[in-house]
Amino acid sequence: MSGQGPQRRLLGSLNATSPTTPHFKLAANQTGPRCLEVSIPDGLFLSLGLVSVVENVLVVAAIAKNRNLHSPMYYFIGCLAVSDLLVSVTNVLETAVMLLVEAGALAAQAAVVQQLDDIIDVLICGSMVSSLCFLGAIAVDRYLSIFYALRYHSIVTLPRAWRAISAIWVASVLSSTLFIAYYNHTAVLLCLVSFFVAMLVLMAVLYVHMLARARQHARGIARLRKRQHSVHQGFGLKGAATLTILLGIFFLCWGPFFLHLSLMVLCPQHPICGCVFQNFNLFLTLIICNSIIDPFIYAFRSQELRKTLQEVVLCSW
């Protein structure tokens, strides 16, 4: 992808460009401001991608192996792992092909590289959209399990969960295809940015409401035990910290990428916005980091899944 559109790393590798360096540097031109550009070494990018691949493959394998994990909640978590897996695999594949082309180990015409790049971009964008969707689906599922506990199993059934999962994947493929085909259209970029904001607001509202309900429940228990202050204060701090970490990681890892898209609409030619565009690979790296962190937030906290994961790692099928 390019600086002012989806970055085309493969196509750009056909041109004479300087290699990336593993340090911060200030970029400047004759008319623009000095910019802080963070260069991401390809080795680091590939390493992070491979770590994410291993983690998410283990999550999917554990859920597939243990029948006790064959429930809507874990299916959503498994689909999130698949989405994060695709994010990592496609980015690793794109970087690997780019390095092979630059090294002359892979001879390809520009048209062939462009077609391959378009396919990879569709996969990257689709996996990003599906990842955001499943983060929202997990939030909705947890909300229903708390506020509609008695009716949860009649509301969130396996057929409904599979229909929701299918709809998310179909919508992700269609939207990513349109985005790559019409990435230079303002309306498409605005839709993608609006989608991110909607997911952020949805998750914030649901998790804040869940935190409020949990604190209310803790106060009720504290009154029964006649030690309201200590229990309420301790739970409030723990709950607030968990919520801050969950939403903070989501915003920090995904926010810069969508800031990049927003600036493409608001100020595509402004020198200061150009400084942001120069760090697009950093924003992709943050998304890869999110794919590494997601299993720790949503999957590895489950004792049942951790136990199954140990069996998978030890190959005790």
UniProtKB/Swiss-Prot annotation:
Q: Which residues cross the membrane?
A: 38-63, 73-93, 119-140, 164-183, 192-211, 241-266, 280-300
PROSITE patterns given in the database record: G_PROTEIN_RECEP_F1_1, G_PROTEIN_RECEP_F1_2
Provide the membrane topology annotation.
Answer: Multi-pass membrane protein
Checking SUPFAM superfamilies in the record gives: Family A G protein-coupled receptor-like
| Name of this chain's protein | Melanocyte-stimulating hormone receptor
* Gene3D superfamilies according to UniProt: Rhodopsin 7-helix transmembrane proteins
Keyword Secreted attached = no
Q: Which residues lie on this side of the membrane: Cytoplasmic?
A: 64-72, 141-163, 212-240, 301-317
* Topological domain spans for side Extracellular: 1-37, 94-118, 184-191, 267-279
Cellular compartment(s): Cell membrane
User: What start and end residues bound the annotated signal peptide?
Assistant: none
Q: Which organism is it from?
A: Vulpes lagopus
The record's comment on protein family reads:
Belongs to the G-protein coupled receptor 1 family.
Q: Does the keyword Thylakoid apply?
A: no
Q: What does this protein do?
A: Receptor for MSH (alpha, beta and gamma) and ACTH. The activity of this receptor is mediated by G proteins which activate adenylate cyclase. Mediates melanogenesis, the production of eumelanin (black/brown) and phaeomelanin (red/yellow), via regulation of cAMP signaling in melanocytes.
Its subunit composition reads: Interacts with MGRN1, but does not undergo MGRN1-mediated ubiquitination; this interaction competes with GNAS-binding and thus inhibits agonist-induced cAMP production. Interacts with OPN3; the interaction results in a decrease in MC1R-mediated cAMP signaling and ultimately a decrease in melanin production in melanocytes.
Which residues are modified by lipidation (S-palmitoyl cysteine)?
A: C315
